[in-house]
C-alpha cells in the first residue's frame, strides 16, 4: 500500500451500558471495619482492597452503570477497534480473530477508562489475581469483556476493508543473515 494512500477512512461508534458489580452487604460491612482498623491491624493488602470496596460503594451511589464507548476507525485495510478498558490479552486476541480486516489493532484505554476487564475464565475457581478483585477500578459485570468484544467485532463487520496492496517479496539473505544477535558476550 503506498504511503498515505487510503481509499477508505471511516469510523463508527457504539455505546454500551454495562452494570457494575456490587459488593454484598457483609463484604461492605467487613471492609468498613478493616478500613477503620487501618493497614497495621488489617494487613496492607486487606486494607487496600477494603478501601477499594468502600470507594466502589460510594461510586455505585452515583454511577451504578458504566457507559462504555467502543469505536472502530478504518484506514483502508487497517482497523483500530477501541475500548476504554485494560483488557486481558485474550479479549484482544478474540477481537482480532473476529475481525474481517487483514490488519486489526485492538486499542485499550481509548475514550475513557472503565478499569480492568478480565476474561470470564479469570473469574472461575482457577482464575484470580488483583484484576478480578471487586474494587473501584475493576467492577464491571463479569460478561463485560465478551460484550465489548462482540460490539467491536460487529462494528468491524459493518465496514468493508480495502484491498491490501501487493508488495514484492523481500530479497533473500544470500546466506549472510544479520549477525548482530549471534555475537558472544564481551567481558574484557
Task: Show where each model-derived region lies.
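Non-catalytic substrate/cofactor recognition surfaces at enzyme active-site rims
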Residues: 1-188
Amino acid at each position: 500500500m503506498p504511503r498515505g494512500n487510503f481509499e477508505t477512512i471511516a469510523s463508527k461508534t457504539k455505546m454500551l451500558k454495562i452494570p457494575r458489580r456490587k459488593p454484598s452487604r457483609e463484604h461492605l460491612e467487613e471492609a468498613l471495619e478493616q478500613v477503620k482498623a487501618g493497614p497495621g491491624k488489617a494487613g496492607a493488602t486487606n486494607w487496600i482492597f477494603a478501601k477499594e470496596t468502600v470507594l466502589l460503594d460510594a461510586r455505585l451511589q452515583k454511577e451504578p452503570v458504566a457507559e462504555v464507548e467502543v469505536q472502530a476507525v478504518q484506514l483502508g485495510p487497517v482497523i483500530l477497534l477501541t475500548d476504554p478498558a485494560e483488557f486481558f490479552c485474550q479479549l484482544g486476541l478474540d477481537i482480532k480473530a473476529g475481525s474481517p480486516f487483514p490488519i486489526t489493532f485492538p486499542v485499550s484505554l481509548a475514550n475513557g477508562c472503565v478499569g480492568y476487564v478480565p476474561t470470564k475464565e479469570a473469574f472461575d475457581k482457577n482464575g484470580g489475581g488483583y484484576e478480578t478483585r471487586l474494587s473501584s477500578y475493576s467492577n464491571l459485570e463479569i460478561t463485560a469483556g465478551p460484550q465489548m468484544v462482540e460490539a467491536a467485532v460487529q462494528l468491524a463487520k459493518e465496514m468493508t476493508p480495502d484491498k491490501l496492496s501487493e508488495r514484492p517479496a523481500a530479497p533473500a539473505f544470500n546466506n549472510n543473515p544479520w549477525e548482530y544477535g549471534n555475537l558472544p558476550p564481551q567481558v574484557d
